[in-house]
Amino acid sequence: MAGNVQEKQLRWYNIALMSFITVWGFGNVVNNYANQGLVVVFSWVFIFALYFTPYALIVGQLGSTFKDGRGGVSTWIKHTMGPGLAYLAAWTYWVVHIPYLAQKPQAILIALGWAMKGDGSLIKEYSVVALQGLTLVLFIFFMWVASRGMKSLKIVGSVAGIAMFVMSLLYVAMAVTAPAITEVHIATTNITWETFIPHIDFTYITTISMLVFAVGGAEKISPYVNQTRNPGKEFPKGMLCLAVMVAVCAILGSLAMGMMFDSRNIPDDLMTNGQYYAFQKLGEYYSMGNTLMVIYAIANTLGQVAALVFSIDAPLKVLLGDADSKYIPASLCRTNASGTPVNGYFLTLVLVAILIMLPTLGIGDTNNLYKWLLNLNSVVMPLRYLWVFVAFIAVVRLAQKYKPEYVFIRNKPLAMTVGIWCFAFTAFACLTGIFPKMEAFTAEWTFQLALNVATPFVLVGLGLIFPLLARKANSK
Protein backbone atom coordinates (compact mmCIF):
# COMPACT_ATOMS: atom_id res chain seq x y z
CA MET A 1 0.00 0.00 0.00
CA ALA A 2 2.80 2.38 0.91
CA GLY A 3 4.57 1.57 -2.36
CA ASN A 4 1.44 2.41 -4.33
CA VAL A 5 1.13 5.77 -2.57
CA GLN A 6 4.83 6.40 -3.16
CA GLU A 7 4.40 5.82 -6.92
CA LYS A 8 1.56 8.32 -7.19
CA GLN A 9 3.46 11.46 -6.32
CA LEU A 10 2.83 13.61 -9.42
CA ARG A 11 0.63 16.61 -8.74
CA TRP A 12 -1.44 18.60 -11.23
CA TYR A 13 1.28 21.24 -11.63
CA ASN A 14 3.89 18.53 -12.38
CA ILE A 15 1.62 17.16 -15.11
CA ALA A 16 1.02 20.65 -16.53
CA LEU A 17 4.74 21.53 -16.73
CA MET A 18 5.83 18.14 -18.12
CA SER A 19 3.09 18.29 -20.73
CA PHE A 20 3.89 21.88 -21.67
CA ILE A 21 7.52 21.06 -22.49
CA THR A 22 6.36 18.03 -24.51
CA VAL A 23 3.66 19.77 -26.56
CA TRP A 24 4.78 23.35 -27.06
CA GLY A 25 7.58 25.15 -28.90
CA PHE A 26 8.35 28.67 -30.15
CA GLY A 27 8.25 27.48 -33.76
CA ASN A 28 4.50 26.89 -33.38
CA VAL A 29 4.00 30.63 -32.80
CA VAL A 30 6.18 31.67 -35.75
CA ASN A 31 4.81 29.18 -38.29
CA ASN A 32 1.17 29.99 -37.62
CA TYR A 33 1.78 33.75 -37.53
CA ALA A 34 3.50 33.38 -40.91
CA ASN A 35 0.34 31.71 -42.22
CA GLN A 36 -2.32 33.96 -40.71
CA GLY A 37 -0.84 37.13 -39.21
CA LEU A 38 -2.68 38.51 -36.15
CA VAL A 39 -5.82 36.64 -37.20
CA VAL A 40 -4.10 33.65 -35.61
CA VAL A 41 -5.08 35.00 -32.16
CA PHE A 42 -8.73 34.13 -32.92
CA SER A 43 -7.63 30.79 -34.36
CA TRP A 44 -5.70 29.89 -31.21
CA VAL A 45 -8.71 30.62 -28.99
CA PHE A 46 -10.91 28.41 -31.18
CA ILE A 47 -8.37 25.56 -31.31
CA PHE A 48 -7.74 25.51 -27.57
CA ALA A 49 -11.40 25.73 -26.57
CA LEU A 50 -12.89 23.24 -29.02
CA TYR A 51 -10.03 20.91 -29.94
CA PHE A 52 -6.90 20.87 -27.79
CA THR A 53 -8.61 20.75 -24.37
CA PRO A 54 -10.89 17.78 -25.22
CA TYR A 55 -7.98 16.10 -27.03
CA ALA A 56 -5.75 16.30 -23.94
CA LEU A 57 -8.50 15.03 -21.63
CA ILE A 58 -9.33 12.18 -24.02
CA VAL A 59 -5.68 11.11 -23.80
CA GLY A 60 -6.01 11.21 -20.02
CA GLN A 61 -8.93 8.78 -20.06
CA LEU A 62 -7.23 6.40 -22.51
CA GLY A 63 -4.03 6.38 -20.48
CA SER A 64 -6.01 5.63 -17.33
CA THR A 65 -8.01 2.89 -19.06
CA PHE A 66 -4.93 1.03 -20.34
CA LYS A 67 -2.49 1.86 -17.57
CA ASP A 68 -0.42 -1.32 -18.06
CA GLY A 69 -0.04 -0.92 -21.83
CA ARG A 70 3.37 0.22 -23.07
CA GLY A 71 2.57 0.66 -26.75
CA GLY A 72 0.53 3.84 -26.43
CA VAL A 73 -1.99 4.27 -29.23
CA SER A 74 -1.38 0.80 -30.70
CA THR A 75 -2.11 -0.77 -27.28
CA TRP A 76 -5.39 1.15 -27.05
CA ILE A 77 -6.43 0.00 -30.52
CA LYS A 78 -5.34 -3.61 -29.88
CA HIS A 79 -7.55 -3.90 -26.80
CA THR A 80 -10.58 -2.25 -28.37
CA MET A 81 -10.44 -3.19 -32.06
CA GLY A 82 -8.03 -6.11 -32.45
CA PRO A 83 -4.41 -6.73 -33.53
CA GLY A 84 -4.94 -5.96 -37.24
CA LEU A 85 -5.92 -2.35 -36.71
CA ALA A 86 -3.37 -2.10 -33.88
CA TYR A 87 -0.65 -2.92 -36.41
CA LEU A 88 -1.99 -0.26 -38.78
CA ALA A 89 -2.03 2.29 -35.94
CA ALA A 90 1.58 1.42 -35.03
CA TRP A 91 2.58 1.65 -38.69
CA THR A 92 0.90 5.05 -39.04
CA TYR A 93 2.66 6.32 -35.91
CA TRP A 94 6.03 5.36 -37.40
CA VAL A 95 5.57 6.24 -41.05
CA VAL A 96 4.26 9.79 -40.45
CA HIS A 97 7.73 10.57 -39.06
CA ILE A 98 9.27 10.14 -42.55
CA PRO A 99 8.49 13.73 -43.73
CA TYR A 100 9.64 14.93 -40.29
CA LEU A 101 12.97 13.13 -40.76
CA ALA A 102 13.31 14.55 -44.27
CA GLN A 103 12.82 18.11 -42.98
CA LYS A 104 15.02 17.99 -39.86
CA PRO A 105 18.48 18.07 -41.55
CA GLN A 106 17.46 21.20 -43.45
CA ALA A 107 16.31 22.81 -40.18
CA ILE A 108 19.70 21.91 -38.65
CA LEU A 109 21.53 23.65 -41.53
CA ILE A 110 19.38 26.77 -41.12
CA ALA A 111 20.00 26.92 -37.35
CA LEU A 112 23.72 26.28 -37.86
CA GLY A 113 23.88 29.04 -40.48
CA TRP A 114 22.36 31.58 -38.09
CA ALA A 115 24.68 30.48 -35.26
CA MET A 116 27.81 30.74 -37.45
CA LYS A 117 27.04 33.61 -39.84
CA GLY A 118 24.39 35.60 -37.99
CA ASP A 119 21.95 35.46 -40.90
CA GLY A 120 19.98 33.03 -43.07
CA SER A 121 22.30 33.09 -46.07
CA LEU A 122 23.89 29.65 -45.60
CA ILE A 123 21.25 27.60 -47.42
CA LYS A 124 20.85 30.31 -50.08
CA GLU A 125 24.43 29.67 -51.19
CA TYR A 126 23.38 26.29 -52.62
CA SER A 127 21.10 25.29 -55.46
CA VAL A 128 18.07 23.23 -54.44
CA VAL A 129 19.68 20.02 -55.76
CA ALA A 130 22.97 20.70 -53.94
CA LEU A 131 21.14 21.64 -50.72
CA GLN A 132 19.06 18.47 -50.74
CA GLY A 133 22.14 16.40 -51.55
CA LEU A 134 23.85 17.90 -48.50
CA THR A 135 20.68 17.29 -46.49
CA LEU A 136 20.74 13.62 -47.48
CA VAL A 137 24.42 13.26 -46.51
CA LEU A 138 23.63 14.88 -43.16
CA PHE A 139 20.72 12.50 -42.61
CA ILE A 140 22.89 9.44 -43.38
CA PHE A 141 25.49 10.68 -40.88
CA PHE A 142 22.92 11.11 -38.11
CA MET A 143 21.39 7.74 -38.95
CA TRP A 144 24.83 6.27 -38.26
CA VAL A 145 24.94 8.24 -34.99
CA ALA A 146 21.50 6.86 -34.05
CA SER A 147 22.70 3.31 -34.72
CA ARG A 148 25.52 3.86 -32.22
CA GLY A 149 23.06 4.77 -29.46
CA MET A 150 24.92 7.81 -28.14
CA LYS A 151 23.28 8.52 -24.78
CA SER A 152 25.32 11.69 -24.24
CA LEU A 153 23.64 13.24 -27.30
CA LYS A 154 20.23 12.71 -25.69
CA ILE A 155 21.45 14.51 -22.56
CA VAL A 156 22.74 17.42 -24.67
CA GLY A 157 19.40 17.44 -26.50
CA SER A 158 17.48 17.59 -23.23
CA VAL A 159 19.56 20.53 -22.00
CA ALA A 160 19.16 22.29 -25.37
CA GLY A 161 15.41 21.63 -25.32
CA ILE A 162 15.06 23.16 -21.86
CA ALA A 163 17.16 26.15 -22.99
CA MET A 164 14.90 26.67 -26.02
CA PHE A 165 11.84 26.36 -23.80
CA VAL A 166 13.18 28.98 -21.36
CA MET A 167 14.17 31.32 -24.21
CA SER A 168 10.73 30.97 -25.79
CA LEU A 169 9.12 32.15 -22.54
CA LEU A 170 11.78 34.85 -22.25
CA TYR A 171 10.95 36.04 -25.76
CA VAL A 172 7.26 36.44 -24.91
CA ALA A 173 8.04 38.34 -21.69
CA MET A 174 10.69 40.63 -23.21
CA ALA A 175 8.83 41.30 -26.47
CA VAL A 176 5.48 42.12 -24.86
CA THR A 177 7.09 44.52 -22.37
CA ALA A 178 9.47 46.10 -24.93
CA PRO A 179 7.19 49.05 -25.90
CA ALA A 180 6.94 50.10 -22.25
CA ILE A 181 10.67 49.72 -21.54
CA THR A 182 12.26 50.78 -24.84
CA GLU A 183 11.38 53.22 -27.62
CA VAL A 184 10.46 50.47 -30.08
CA HIS A 185 7.66 51.16 -32.55
CA ILE A 186 4.97 48.53 -33.18
CA ALA A 187 5.25 47.16 -36.74
CA THR A 188 1.52 46.42 -37.16
CA THR A 189 -0.30 49.76 -37.03
CA ASN A 190 -3.98 50.55 -36.46
CA ILE A 191 -4.76 47.36 -34.53
CA THR A 192 -8.51 47.03 -33.89
CA TRP A 193 -10.83 44.15 -33.04
CA GLU A 194 -11.30 43.58 -36.77
CA THR A 195 -7.56 42.85 -37.07
CA PHE A 196 -8.12 39.57 -35.22
CA ILE A 197 -11.30 38.41 -37.02
CA PRO A 198 -10.54 35.94 -39.83
CA HIS A 199 -12.04 36.11 -43.28
CA ILE A 200 -13.28 32.53 -43.54
CA ASP A 201 -12.30 31.59 -47.08
CA PHE A 202 -10.47 28.69 -48.71
CA THR A 203 -7.04 30.24 -48.06
CA TYR A 204 -7.76 30.48 -44.32
CA ILE A 205 -9.14 26.93 -44.16
CA THR A 206 -5.97 25.48 -45.72
CA THR A 207 -3.92 26.85 -42.79
CA ILE A 208 -5.87 24.96 -40.09
CA SER A 209 -3.67 21.87 -40.45
CA MET A 210 -0.66 23.82 -39.16
CA LEU A 211 -2.62 24.73 -36.00
CA VAL A 212 -3.60 21.09 -35.43
CA PHE A 213 0.02 20.05 -36.04
CA ALA A 214 1.16 22.63 -33.46
CA VAL A 215 -0.98 21.32 -30.58
CA GLY A 216 -0.70 17.59 -31.32
CA GLY A 217 1.30 15.01 -29.43
CA ALA A 218 -0.64 14.98 -26.16
CA GLU A 219 -0.77 11.16 -26.31
CA LYS A 220 2.84 11.17 -25.05
CA ILE A 221 1.44 12.32 -21.68
CA SER A 222 -0.77 9.27 -21.12
CA PRO A 223 1.74 7.10 -19.17
CA TYR A 224 1.68 9.65 -16.34
CA VAL A 225 -2.06 9.41 -15.60
CA ASN A 226 -1.71 6.56 -13.14
CA GLN A 227 1.38 8.07 -11.52
CA THR A 228 -0.72 11.07 -10.51
CA ARG A 229 -2.14 11.52 -7.03
CA ASN A 230 -5.94 11.38 -7.18
CA PRO A 231 -5.93 11.19 -11.02
CA GLY A 232 -9.69 11.67 -11.31
CA LYS A 233 -9.28 15.27 -10.09
CA GLU A 234 -5.63 16.23 -10.49
CA PHE A 235 -4.96 14.97 -14.03
CA PRO A 236 -7.78 16.94 -15.70
CA LYS A 237 -6.77 19.95 -13.57
CA GLY A 238 -3.23 19.58 -14.92
CA MET A 239 -4.53 19.30 -18.49
CA LEU A 240 -6.71 22.38 -18.10
CA CYS A 241 -3.70 24.22 -16.68
CA LEU A 242 -1.69 23.04 -19.71
CA ALA A 243 -4.36 24.39 -22.07
CA VAL A 244 -4.31 27.77 -20.30
CA MET A 245 -0.48 27.94 -20.33
CA VAL A 246 -0.23 27.05 -24.01
CA ALA A 247 -3.06 29.44 -24.90
CA VAL A 248 -1.40 32.32 -23.03
CA CYS A 249 1.99 31.64 -24.67
CA ALA A 250 0.42 31.27 -28.13
CA ILE A 251 -1.68 34.43 -27.87
CA LEU A 252 1.00 36.62 -26.25
CA GLY A 253 3.64 35.18 -28.59
CA SER A 254 1.46 35.99 -31.61
CA LEU A 255 0.88 39.54 -30.33
CA ALA A 256 4.64 39.90 -29.85
CA MET A 257 5.18 38.74 -33.45
CA GLY A 258 2.65 41.38 -34.54
CA MET A 259 4.72 44.02 -32.79
CA MET A 260 7.86 42.95 -34.69
CA PHE A 261 6.43 41.98 -38.09
CA ASP A 262 3.66 43.83 -39.91
CA SER A 263 0.65 41.50 -39.95
CA ARG A 264 -0.42 42.96 -43.31
CA ASN A 265 3.01 42.53 -44.92
CA ILE A 266 4.53 39.29 -43.60
CA PRO A 267 8.06 38.46 -44.89
CA ASP A 268 8.01 35.57 -47.36
CA ASP A 269 10.74 33.69 -45.48
CA LEU A 270 9.26 34.16 -42.00
CA MET A 271 8.42 30.47 -41.70
CA THR A 272 12.02 29.57 -42.58
CA ASN A 273 13.91 32.22 -40.61
CA GLY A 274 11.28 33.81 -38.35
CA GLN A 275 12.54 32.34 -35.06
CA TYR A 276 15.97 33.89 -35.63
CA TYR A 277 14.61 37.20 -36.95
CA ALA A 278 12.53 37.44 -33.76
CA PHE A 279 15.48 36.99 -31.39
CA GLN A 280 17.64 39.23 -33.56
CA LYS A 281 15.08 42.04 -33.30
CA LEU A 282 14.70 41.39 -29.57
CA GLY A 283 18.45 41.84 -29.16
CA GLU A 284 18.23 45.14 -31.06
CA TYR A 285 15.42 46.36 -28.78
CA TYR A 286 17.53 45.81 -25.66
CA SER A 287 20.92 46.80 -27.19
CA MET A 288 22.25 43.23 -26.96
CA GLY A 289 23.21 42.81 -30.62
CA ASN A 290 22.96 39.23 -31.89
CA THR A 291 23.62 37.64 -28.49
CA LEU A 292 20.09 36.31 -27.89
CA MET A 293 19.78 35.09 -31.48
CA VAL A 294 23.11 33.22 -31.41
CA ILE A 295 22.27 31.55 -28.07
CA TYR A 296 18.89 30.47 -29.44
CA ALA A 297 20.43 29.27 -32.74
CA ILE A 298 23.04 27.15 -30.92
CA ALA A 299 20.40 25.67 -28.60
CA ASN A 300 18.12 25.03 -31.56
CA THR A 301 20.91 23.33 -33.54
CA LEU A 302 21.64 20.94 -30.68
CA GLY A 303 17.95 20.38 -30.00
CA GLN A 304 17.22 19.62 -33.66
CA VAL A 305 20.13 17.16 -33.84
CA ALA A 306 18.93 15.30 -30.74
CA ALA A 307 15.33 15.29 -32.04
CA LEU A 308 16.49 13.86 -35.38
CA VAL A 309 18.55 11.09 -33.80
CA PHE A 310 15.75 10.19 -31.38
CA SER A 311 13.11 10.22 -34.14
CA ILE A 312 15.17 7.93 -36.38
CA ASP A 313 15.46 5.29 -33.68
CA ALA A 314 12.60 5.45 -31.17
CA PRO A 315 9.46 5.27 -33.40
CA LEU A 316 11.03 2.43 -35.44
CA LYS A 317 11.78 0.41 -32.31
CA VAL A 318 8.21 0.99 -31.09
CA LEU A 319 6.95 -0.46 -34.39
CA LEU A 320 9.34 -3.43 -34.52
CA GLY A 321 9.92 -4.05 -30.80
CA ASP A 322 6.58 -5.80 -30.23
CA ALA A 323 5.95 -6.77 -33.85
CA ASP A 324 3.40 -9.46 -34.67
CA SER A 325 4.87 -11.91 -37.23
CA LYS A 326 1.45 -12.03 -38.93
CA TYR A 327 1.81 -8.41 -40.00
CA ILE A 328 5.54 -7.60 -40.14
CA PRO A 329 8.09 -9.92 -41.84
CA ALA A 330 10.74 -11.27 -39.47
CA SER A 331 13.44 -10.03 -41.87
CA LEU A 332 12.41 -6.42 -41.17
CA CYS A 333 12.91 -6.97 -37.44
CA ARG A 334 16.43 -8.41 -37.74
CA THR A 335 18.93 -6.60 -35.51
CA ASN A 336 22.73 -6.46 -35.44
CA ALA A 337 25.00 -7.02 -32.43
CA SER A 338 24.23 -3.56 -31.02
CA GLY A 339 20.46 -4.06 -31.28
CA THR A 340 19.95 -1.82 -34.32
CA PRO A 341 17.14 -3.00 -36.67
CA VAL A 342 19.31 -2.98 -39.81
CA ASN A 343 16.60 -3.57 -42.41
CA GLY A 344 14.28 -1.17 -40.63
CA TYR A 345 16.97 1.50 -40.83
CA PHE A 346 17.47 0.73 -44.53
CA LEU A 347 13.73 1.10 -45.19
CA THR A 348 13.79 4.44 -43.34
CA LEU A 349 16.76 5.61 -45.43
CA VAL A 350 15.08 4.69 -48.73
CA LEU A 351 11.83 6.49 -47.89
CA VAL A 352 13.58 9.59 -46.51
CA ALA A 353 16.01 9.75 -49.46
CA ILE A 354 13.10 9.70 -51.92
CA LEU A 355 11.28 12.44 -50.00
CA ILE A 356 14.44 14.56 -49.82
CA MET A 357 15.41 14.33 -53.50
CA LEU A 358 12.03 14.03 -55.29
CA PRO A 359 10.96 17.67 -54.65
CA THR A 360 14.04 18.93 -56.51
CA LEU A 361 12.26 17.96 -59.74
CA GLY A 362 9.62 20.66 -59.32
CA ILE A 363 10.53 23.08 -56.50
CA GLY A 364 13.23 25.51 -57.53
CA ASP A 365 13.58 27.72 -54.44
CA THR A 366 15.11 26.76 -51.07
CA ASN A 367 12.61 28.86 -49.12
CA ASN A 368 9.63 27.26 -50.90
CA LEU A 369 11.20 23.84 -50.35
CA TYR A 370 11.43 24.39 -46.58
CA LYS A 371 7.86 25.69 -46.39
CA TRP A 372 6.58 22.78 -48.48
CA LEU A 373 8.19 20.18 -46.19
CA LEU A 374 6.84 21.94 -43.10
CA ASN A 375 3.34 22.08 -44.58
CA LEU A 376 3.61 18.42 -45.63
CA ASN A 377 4.35 17.56 -41.99
CA SER A 378 1.20 19.44 -40.97
CA VAL A 379 -0.79 17.18 -43.32
CA VAL A 380 0.85 13.84 -42.52
CA MET A 381 1.72 14.02 -38.80
CA PRO A 382 -1.88 14.58 -37.56
CA LEU A 383 -2.89 11.28 -39.21
CA ARG A 384 -1.62 9.53 -36.08
CA TYR A 385 -3.93 11.65 -33.91
CA LEU A 386 -6.90 10.09 -35.72
CA TRP A 387 -6.16 6.76 -34.02
CA VAL A 388 -6.41 8.45 -30.60
CA PHE A 389 -9.99 9.46 -31.33
CA VAL A 390 -10.81 6.07 -32.88
CA ALA A 391 -9.63 4.42 -29.65
CA PHE A 392 -11.67 6.85 -27.53
CA ILE A 393 -14.85 6.21 -29.55
CA ALA A 394 -14.27 2.46 -29.13
CA VAL A 395 -13.76 2.83 -25.36
CA VAL A 396 -16.97 4.85 -25.05
CA ARG A 397 -18.81 2.21 -27.04
CA LEU A 398 -17.43 -0.50 -24.69
CA ALA A 399 -17.96 1.58 -21.53
CA GLN A 400 -19.26 -1.39 -19.50
CA LYS A 401 -16.03 -3.30 -20.11
CA TYR A 402 -13.59 -0.66 -18.84
CA LYS A 403 -13.51 1.11 -15.46
CA PRO A 404 -10.72 3.72 -15.57
CA GLU A 405 -9.86 5.91 -12.58
CA TYR A 406 -10.41 9.01 -14.69
CA VAL A 407 -13.34 9.50 -17.09
CA PHE A 408 -13.46 12.62 -19.28
CA ILE A 409 -17.23 12.65 -19.99
CA ARG A 410 -19.60 10.25 -18.24
CA ASN A 411 -22.56 10.98 -20.52
CA LYS A 412 -22.13 8.37 -23.28
CA PRO A 413 -23.85 10.22 -26.20
CA LEU A 414 -21.96 13.43 -25.38
CA ALA A 415 -18.64 11.57 -25.09
CA MET A 416 -19.28 9.89 -28.45
CA THR A 417 -20.11 13.26 -30.04
CA VAL A 418 -16.88 14.83 -28.73
CA GLY A 419 -14.82 11.89 -30.02
CA ILE A 420 -16.43 12.07 -33.47
CA TRP A 421 -15.97 15.88 -33.57
CA CYS A 422 -12.24 15.63 -32.79
CA PHE A 423 -11.78 12.87 -35.38
CA ALA A 424 -13.72 14.77 -38.06
CA PHE A 425 -11.93 18.07 -37.36
CA THR A 426 -8.50 16.40 -37.58
CA ALA A 427 -9.42 14.65 -40.84
CA PHE A 428 -10.80 17.91 -42.24
CA ALA A 429 -7.58 19.75 -41.35
CA CYS A 430 -5.46 17.06 -43.04
CA LEU A 431 -7.59 17.11 -46.21
CA THR A 432 -7.66 20.89 -46.60
CA GLY A 433 -3.99 21.19 -45.66
CA ILE A 434 -2.91 19.37 -48.83
CA PHE A 435 -3.47 22.52 -50.89
CA PRO A 436 -0.22 24.56 -51.23
CA LYS A 437 -0.14 28.04 -49.71
CA MET A 438 0.97 29.85 -52.88
CA GLU A 439 -0.38 31.18 -56.19
CA ALA A 440 -2.78 28.51 -57.47
CA PHE A 441 -2.52 26.51 -60.69
CA THR A 442 1.10 27.37 -61.43
CA ALA A 443 3.45 24.50 -62.37
CA GLU A 444 5.01 24.48 -58.87
CA TRP A 445 1.59 24.63 -57.15
CA THR A 446 0.43 21.60 -59.17
CA PHE A 447 3.66 19.73 -58.39
CA GLN A 448 3.36 20.43 -54.65
CA LEU A 449 -0.31 19.42 -54.64
CA ALA A 450 0.52 16.13 -56.37
CA LEU A 451 3.21 15.38 -53.77
CA ASN A 452 0.90 16.37 -50.89
CA VAL A 453 -1.80 13.99 -52.14
CA ALA A 454 0.51 11.11 -53.03
CA THR A 455 2.78 11.14 -49.96
CA PRO A 456 0.26 10.20 -47.22
CA PHE A 457 -1.40 7.58 -49.45
CA VAL A 458 1.92 5.98 -50.37
CA LEU A 459 3.33 6.06 -46.83
CA VAL A 460 0.22 4.65 -45.14
CA GLY A 461 -0.46 2.33 -48.09
CA LEU A 462 2.97 0.70 -47.69
CA GLY A 463 1.70 -0.60 -44.38
CA LEU A 464 -0.83 -2.75 -46.24
CA ILE A 465 1.93 -4.49 -48.19
CA PHE A 466 3.93 -5.84 -45.25
CA PRO A 467 1.18 -8.17 -43.93
CA LEU A 468 1.11 -9.77 -47.40
CA LEU A 469 4.90 -10.21 -47.33
CA ALA A 470 4.69 -11.60 -43.79
CA ARG A 471 1.99 -14.07 -44.83
CA LYS A 472 4.11 -15.21 -47.78
CA ALA A 473 7.21 -15.61 -45.58
CA ASN A 474 5.27 -17.51 -42.91
CA SER A 475 3.79 -19.91 -45.47
CA LYS A 476 7.32 -20.93 -46.47
Where are the regions a protein language model picked out?
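Hydrophobic transmembrane alpha-helices that form the core helical bundles
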Residues: 54-61, 69-135, 304-315, 375, ...
